[in-house]
């Protein structure tokens, strides 16, 4: 029996989709640049028309990832941060990449406040002022670009232009995409009204393959995937985020292999400690703004998974990344003004160099942060002097 990848949205899901597309999202400018108030349905429509006008072939526009999952199962407590939009386009060469970037930056001018003088605002100026992240990938398997628009609360509007992408999901619960073109056409009709008797047919697809199976995983908050060896390094960070938000492995007998794959891939893609730190900090910034204790729980969960399932590192590399995660977690506690209780912390002390010639060493305490032992998957909660835990 073949898998069914598609389904039509119900009336309630279409209403949720309409609310998401009609919500005003602020795009914050750097420095003295003003904040733009943008509705997703407007910018998606304008960008699509601009690309077509510039000769770019646009197959469709879709909502992707956590926002699509939210629309399908918002009643299950599913939430989202970023609003990910995928434009299916043809990008045969570098020239088309440049056309896409310039078209998007030009569209942003339309959303500036009316009193702003736009004549001297070049694409480069708009990029520096409003783009948080600009990515271009073109290799044997993947050909896509990403323009992420800045939002200080972490609710970034991410526009992704995909010509080819070997893998478009990490886990079944984030494999959903919702085709937006019927809604865009509906919005273009000024006389159309969204009613239960008359609403557009909107299709959702699971890139995982079996839509109903993926939907069951989403409804029951289960972690499952296919071909884990294809998951890139960021999959480890997403996996730990799912754990922190109440998701559980669908199959406990397979989860250790999955964790080992993800840990190995993370350290292959980010081999140096500086890269690892940058990647983790970026993930925290994008997904945990204003969520201090959740951020702390996330770091402790990441610590547990790395500690239990990393098999590809030398001993000193392993200690290095675990120490980094621990220090990041303690920094979060410091920002929350929560002081750790050290009564149950095991400390190991290094004897001073001038005792090296002695056969027996006395124990001295030196002012260095001691190693801290954490249990995997069960984040520690230090009890502070202010009563918080």
Curated annotation (Swiss-Prot):
The keyword Nucleotidyltransferase applies. Changing residue 136 to P: Decrease about 50% the poly(A) elongation activity. Changing residue 312 to E: Does not affect poly (A) elongation activity. Decrease about 50% the poly(A) elongation activity. One of its GO terms (biological process) is mRNA stabilization. Keywords: Nucleotidyltransferase, Transferase. InterPro entries: TET5 (IPR012937). Its EC number is 2.7.7.19. One of its GO terms (molecular function) is poly(A) RNA polymerase activity. restricted to testis. Pfam families: NTP_transf_7. It catalyses: RNA(n) + ATP = RNA(n)-3'-adenine ribonucleotide + diphosphate. Belongs to the TENT family. Catalyzes the transfer of one adenosine molecule from an ATP to an mRNA poly(A) tail bearing a 3'-OH terminal group. This is Terminal nucleotidyltransferase 5D. It comes from Homo sapiens. The gene is TENT5D.
